[in-house]
Each structure stands twice: as C-alpha cells, then as structure tokens.
Amino acid sequence: KELRENRNIQMERVDEGVLINFFSETDRNLFDESSGDDLALSDYGLMALNSVGVLLARYNLNNGKGSSIEITGHTPEGVDDPWSMSAKQSALVFDEILKSGVQESQVVKIIGAGDSIPLDAEKPGDMKNRRFEILIRTKPEE
C-alpha cells in the first residue's frame, strides 16, 4: 500500500524485468542535503527504498533461480562533479538494499550516469533528475 501511494516511485515492467524509479522533488528529496561531503539518504529516501525491500527480497528468491540487480544514480544538470555524485548515490543505495536481505552477489552493476540522461531534455536541471533506478533483471543480459 505504501508503495502504491508514493508518487515519487514508479515501477514498470521492461523487457529485462522490473524497473523501479525513485525521484526527488523539491519537498521530497531522496538525499540529505545537510550531510555535507558525507552523502546520505534522507528519511524520505530511506522510507522510499524500504518500501520496495519486500519486492527485492521476493525477486531474490525468484523460485530458486534468483535474479540480478542493477543500480543507476542520476543527477540534475548543474551539480558539481555529476559523475562522482551519481556513483556515490548508487553505492549508497547498494549499501542500503543489502540491509533489506539482497545478496551482494545479486548486484551486478552499480552505475553513475551523472546528468547524461535527464527525464525531460527540456528541463535538465529539474529536481526530479536527482534520482536512482533499480533494475531487477529477471532475464539474462544478452
């Protein structure tokens, strides 16, 4: 229920499996801006990520076949060192999903995409571009 009511999380089936997008907004930032150089998830970011923990654990089992997980971090245009920032975001999300029962061996990619893939090319600096994606790959990569 919590996941369905969260307007900042979008889940969709894709050819590879299930893609979960987590978006920041002005009033709901996924990351704690007051943490200085030590990047941290905000309380909202932790709640959003924890709301999919059960789903991640379910795909972890996948009828004994398991599945792989890819994490991609994104930043809006105008962030200092967007590649480094987005890589740090992905690593932070990785650390948190391990706490939810995901096995380290399941996470096959941790990607920092910087500001190279804005949601809306017309608004590359929009807060929604400060986001991360989790791909639960249920089909092997070709």
Language-model-derived ranges and their functions:
Residues 13, 64, 125-129:
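Short coil/turn motifs at beta-sheet boundaries
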Residues 6-8, 64-68, 105-107:
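Short secondary-structure junction motifs
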Residues 1-63, 139-142:
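Periplasmic peptidoglycan-binding/tethering modules of Gram-negative envelope proteins
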Residues 21, 36-44, 48, 70, ...:
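Periplasmic OmpA-like peptidoglycan-binding domain that tethers envelope proteins to the cell wall
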